[in-house]
């Protein structure tokens, strides 16, 4: 019985370690997605500044149209990057819930093992006392 409880606790500890590892990996993915959003926003700001400079310099309609197409493409990339960041955040939040659940299961397994150990310790002590009484 004790071996089963010890094995159960070991399995729960392994599950918790796996969940924590997944959460750390997803946190890194989330940071990467946030970095991509920041890079695209910086590119949009730079493109807007170049477009304004082009307009101030009196550029041709074709050059302005190229800048506008480039800005539209960057905005689509920003939308995609923001969507990716939101999905990564939701996935990370779900994984944190899985970590909490694994931690709860480990705590329960440890508590069950301790209850069993206390029960058998009390049972052994009672048997020892009973044997001592018989000897007297």
Regions found by a protein language model. Give the residues of each.
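Charge-rich amphipathic alpha-helical interaction elements
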Residues: 1-136
């Amino acid at each position: 019985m004790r071996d089963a409880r010890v094995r159960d606790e070991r399995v729960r500890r392994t599950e918790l370690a796996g969940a924590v590892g997944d959460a750390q990996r997803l946190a890194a993915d989330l940071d990467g997605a946030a970095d991509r959003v920041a890079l695209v926003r910086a590119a949009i700001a730079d493109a807007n500044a170049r477009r304004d400079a082009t307009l101030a310099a009196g550029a041709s309609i074709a050059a302005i149209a190229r800048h506008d197409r480039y800005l539209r493409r960057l905005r689509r990339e920003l939308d995609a990057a923001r969507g990716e960041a939101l999905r990564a955040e939701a996935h990370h939040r779900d994984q944190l819930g899985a970590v909490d659940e694994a931690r709860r299961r480990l705590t329960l397994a440890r508590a069950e093992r301790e209850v069993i150990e206390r029960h058998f310790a009390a049972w052994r002590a009672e048997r020892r006392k009973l044997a001592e009484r018989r000897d007297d």
